[in-house]
Amino acid sequence: MKKSFIVWMGIALMMAAGMSSCSSDDEEKATDYDYLYHVSYFDQDPNLNKQQGYWYDETFIGLTPQKEPPYYLVAIWDSEEGEKALNYIVGKKDGVILNRYDLEGGNRVLLVSNKYISCPYLYISSSYTTNNIIEGDYIRICNMIIVKMKEGKSAEPIATKYAHSLKPNIEETKLSKTVVFDCILNTSYEVLQLAEEINQRDDVEWAEPNMWIPFHTYSRTRH
């Protein structure tokens, strides 16, 4: 009887240890917010060495993302998950984010960061320089694309073809006769690539990303 009792006690202790281990793993996983929000950190913009920019008539305006930290990243969110992910990233204790500055609009911030950040719940724009921008200034890419359709052409085919990347609502500006699309994308690189692709269409006069540009820069833009 005593031997049987010892065996059962051993089994019970093993089961308890297993449950404790599972509980510990679950708790660790539950608090791993990098995993929960799929946050990735990079020493440089992953698209640093790829061509980035936009077309102005027949001229390609090349944009170069920052190569060294601190990085000035614009983060935009449109969901509760995005806001939670942002607050987690900002609150990390290992000094990834040096400063946070709220921007006009209520759902966008400027992050001064030691790392380039990627998160599917956030739109992240790098800060870019170009040949004709004043030193120390940066261009940031908004998650919107402005399109000027050719006379008599509709923007609906664009909305249909790129439904996975553009929001269904189309905002038409009467004054300039342009169409503004909101993007369902995560990086400024993706917005630039899509704007360039749309710009090549036969029914489009021109297409550009919406940009935040310092008022005294020499960068050419139509808006």
Language-model-detected regions and their locations in the chain:
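Compositionally biased regions
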Residues: F5, S21-D25, Y41, D78-E80, ...
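Short small/polar-residue motifs
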Residues: K50, W55-G62, K92-L98, A163-N169
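Bacterial Sec-dependent N-terminal signal peptides
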Residues: K2-I6, M15-S40
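Autoinhibitory propeptides
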Residues: D94-M144, M149-E151, T160-Y162, P168-H223
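Short amphipathic alpha-helix segments
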Residues: E81-G91, K150-S165
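Short Lys/Arg-enriched alpha/beta "domain-start" segment
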Residues: A30-E83
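A short, compositionally biased domain-edge/stem linker segment
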Residues: G18-M19, Y56-L63, I124-E135
